[in-house]
Swiss-Prot record:
Ligand binding (Zn(2+) 2): C101, C104, C107, C115
Name of protein: Cinnamyl alcohol dehydrogenase 4
The entry's keywords: Lignin biosynthesis, Metal-binding, NADP, Oxidoreductase, Zinc
Cofactor comment text: Binds 2 Zn(2+) ions per subunit.
Documented EC number(s): 1.1.1.195
């Protein structure tokens, strides 16, 4: 197939239908391939902790049926007449955002992820009024502006986590000028995002300390991920050893936790960068901030430009994600294991290698 703008296309994925979060086969339709669209056959898709929040309606904004998945790697099957960046056969990626207004300050600054009218890759409504559905499916149609090329020679299953976990770490390091060799950084939480934080920061030449709630992952962090140090956050003596020593901490923890112990670890002008999606208010005492001119900031995924940069960076440095592949009919088991933190460190669903059996009612969304 070449440059075609045909009718709607059928897709088959796995969807959650209610806040139980249980996924099952689901048939639906995609919009026709528009002039700026890329029609993609999904090869694989990473599982992010945010997917749990969405399928379980933890944020109170879920719409069902919902096909999750926003770390999507696939092959281009068809392109619209105005598509110039991609051709049939290209291996491409799609992340968290698939639309934006294009005219606000974030959009004009190539920071489309901060657009107030951004469109999520799933659990949202596209400009044509149709629900967006994610990458736990056989196909997707995405505007070319929100598609990136996967570097030649990069394994598809390794590329998938970089589209969210990887760029989520890379973006604040780039934005805050924290890419220089010799910095001392902390990674709080060693999950899918945290493990990429260790690898990327080490590749930038940083001294990296992993901060975790127990010592269960100490050997893994140092022996396999390359961390320089490991501190158990519940050990006061260990935390005291870190006092006033770190240039930054990347906080990936997605549940409530006090910030005071980590603010105390930062140097003058140190930065605590929050990434976990938490609906419970966090707390800290202001002297820890004002007496060290410290910064508490948030950072949300990364832009398309930054996604391209992190893919190129990881290819250049030979960085790989630590993953476990599963078939699509193992999604519910994988989600349950992820809830229990029973994965090292990212699940990637082998969509193309799965048997997408059509068992469910069809919708015309």
């Amino acid at each position: 197939m070449g440059s075609v703008e045909a009718g709607e296309k059928k897709a088959l994925g796995w969807a959650a239908r209610d806040p139980s979060g249980v996924l099952s086969p689901y048939s639906y339709t995609l919009r026709s391939t528009g002039a700026d669209d890329v029609y993609i056959k999904v090869i694989c898709c990473g599982i992010c902790h945010t997917d749990i929040h969405q399928i379980k309606n933890d944020l109170g904004m879920s719409n069902y049926p919902m096909v999750p998945g926003h770390e999507v790697v696939g092959e281009v099957l068809e392109v619209g007449s105005d598509v110039s960046k991609f051709t049939v056969g290209d291996v491409v990626g799609v992340g968290v955002v698939v639309g934006c207004c294009g005219s606000c300050k974030p959009c004009s600054s190539e920071l489309e992820q901060y657009c107030n009218k951004r469109i999520w890759s799933y659990n949202d409504v596209y400009t044509d009024g149709k629900p967006t559905q994610g990458g736990f499916a056989d196909t997707m149609i995405v505007n070319q502006k929100f598609v990136v090329k996967i570097p030649e020679g990069m394994a598809v299953e390794q590329a998938a986590p970089l589209l969210c976990a990887g760029v989520t770490v890379y973006s604040p390091l780039s934005h805050f000028g924290l890419m220089a060799s010799g910095l001392k950084g902390g990674i709080l939480g060693l999950g899918g995002v945290g493990h990429m934080g260790v690898k990327i920061a080490k590749a930038m030449g940083h001294h990296v300390t992993v901060i975790s709630s127990s010592d269960k992952k100490k050997e893994e962090a140092i022996e396999h991920l390359g961390a320089d140090d490991y501190v158990v956050s519940s050990d006061p003596a260990e935390m005291q050893r870190l006092a006033d020593s770190l240039d930054y901490i990347i906080d990936t923890v997605p549940v409530f936790h006090p910030l005071d112990p980590y603010l105390a670890c930062l140097k003058l002008d140190g930065k605590l960068i929050l990434m976990g999606v938490i609906n419970t208010p966090l707390q800290f005492v202001t002297p820890l901030v004002i007496l060290g001119r410290k910064v508490i900031s948030g950072s949300f995924i990364g832009s398309i430009k930054e996604t391209e940069e992190v893919l190129a960076f990881c290819k250049e440095k030979g960085l790989t994600s630590t993953i476990e592949t599963v078939k699509i009919d193992e999604l519910n088991i994988a989600f349950e294991r992820l809830r229990k933190n029973d994965v090292r460190y990212r699940f990637v669903v082998d969509v193309a290698g799965s048997n997408l059996v059509e068992e469910a009612a069809t919708t015309t969304n």
